């Protein structure tokens, strides 16, 4: 039977394409893992009175990855470190009572952390029933302040979806997450009534993207709510902290919760100059604390050396210690994911 060489070549080509397609499909079924080559660890050190300890050097720190000490290759403690910071502003009904105060405080925080220099960038996300990227990543803080002035709260609260958006759906700056490093500040009470994402999911996506989360809690007058635990978990797991300005409004005032009044159980009557001054002072002290912490951190970087036992761990835990300082508190991320999520 005669052989048609052209047809034969075509058949071979089809066969090769089919085999190649099979290999591609087979490989596509495997999870795509992108290894983290370097880990960045911002660290805050405070003494037993909450004051920043700012005179430490590289040799004072020890960084452990899965219990194995690491060699720190980059150490930075300059106050002018490049940073990209996301402002996540609660627009739910719960913000209405003190909206004007937090509106003013957020504007102050934006202007302090983004002084119109290229190495400082930020973005603004609001969240009510759903998150919205109001201003994408930019060095222009005045643009964000202008948008902020026109806002009015109302609706539900999609906090977790807002965190997810901050980590995945904005314009990035060349060099992230190392220079600049990534920070998010949540201004809200921690409630979530509308999100599709869960608390666990957004903590993971923040850890994968090396984002440090801070929060300015708007929960009022020292009464703990379960929603505040959301803020605590997000900040502690990523190396940040929660400021609770309204919890301390009455710390220096006798009679709080023991002097009934028609306007409520306040030691300073609502609507008076004293009440307004205490409230504003507490909020702006918290703003100053956040600004100070973000700009005074020690930033360390290392290439993971975890030995055979730590190679395949899906989540690697970090521990940081300092020499000869027993009464200090260290805040840093709890760990990181060495591989990207399955695709």
What are these regions (language model features)?
Residues 9-10, 97:
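Short, low-complexity intrinsically disordered segments
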Residues 11-23:
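Bacterial N-terminal signal peptides
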Residues 27-343:
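Scaffold/interface architecture of coatomer-like assemblies
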Residues 1-8:
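N-terminal secretory signal peptides that target proteins for export/translocation
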